[in-house]
Amino acid sequence: VDGSDVHVLSASSVPTVDLATASFPCTDLSVAGAQAGIRSGESSAFWGFHRVLNEMGAKRRPPVVLIENVVGFLTSHGGRDFRDALLALNQLGYRVDPFILDARWFVPQSRQRMFVVGVLPHLADGDDGRNVAESRIRPGKLTAFIRSHASEIDWSIRELPEPPLKAEKSLKSIVQDPPIGHDDWWNATRVDYFYNQMFPRHQEWIDKRRHASTYHYATAFRRVRPQDDGTKRSMAELRTDGIAGCLRTPKGGSARQILVRVGRGRLDVRLLSADECASLMGADGYRMVGTLNQALFGFGDAVCVDAVSWIATNYLHPLLTAARDVGEPIEWTT
């Protein structure tokens, strides 16, 4: 498939496949974005994907689709955007099954994402939504939505195993520190300024560990916060639980995630490297070219490899294997 805008892509240029995926932009759905909704701006790419599926026709339409976005998709415009997207998939013949995965169950990064699998009727063997059970992958807000739309939306809610409780790796285990004095480390003036941007509780966390015999690590983002005097100030907010915050695209200076190392009488600060971001996305050892910003844009828009692997192993592979067992002519292609 060529690199055309999905809104103008011809369905005739799309090969016949068994699985079509769409991780469309979250810009207009995220609580951190413009919240214009799925019919506006970049997030309207969903409708380009829908158009292509529609134009492929019943004979060529993939039997399985997978869409992905931020969890704000569920609540965007009071749930209307999520409802409209699922009904649009229903109109193409797909019965739908939404669930949420957090990358922190697989890698040391907090990154919740909404996934929706759509299957054509001959593959639909799940629940109709009336009996959906609350779980980590289908928390209360999602199950409430499913139940409240059980008579309107065609569901096929598949029973799935529980994901891991937590990642085997910690933030510390993926860090690749350059030597002291390397240009990646911030100079003393910049570190002092950063320290003075912290809340007192985060300064206390630093101070307690400054003279530890081993290094301790945290991540940080800068966020503008209201102050007691009514003004607003850029604050450096630490995350100290051994998990990185959600990687973002570097559209502003505050979107770049900061790594903090404290111990052995030192406080050292730098940005996360491209290789460290790769590890946080489950792409250890991925060969990268280009600038740090280009890598951050790529990973900020990406889906955690381990989350997708979990879906493939526990959902897509069994689904397509079952289809083969009943004689459906399906080959594993994407």
What residues fall within each predicted segment?
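S-adenosyl-L-methionine
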Residues: 1-11
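Charged/polar, solvent-exposed surface patches and flexible loops
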Residues: 4, 51, 87, 279-282
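Active-site glycine-centered loops adjacent to acidic/histidine catalytic or metal-binding residues
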Residues: 5, 101, 300
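Class I S-adenosyl-L-methionine
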Residues: 9-19, 27-239
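Short, hydrophobic/glycine-enriched beta-strand segments
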Residues: 19-21, 246
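C-terminal target-recognition/interaction regions appended to catalytic cores
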Residues: 181-334
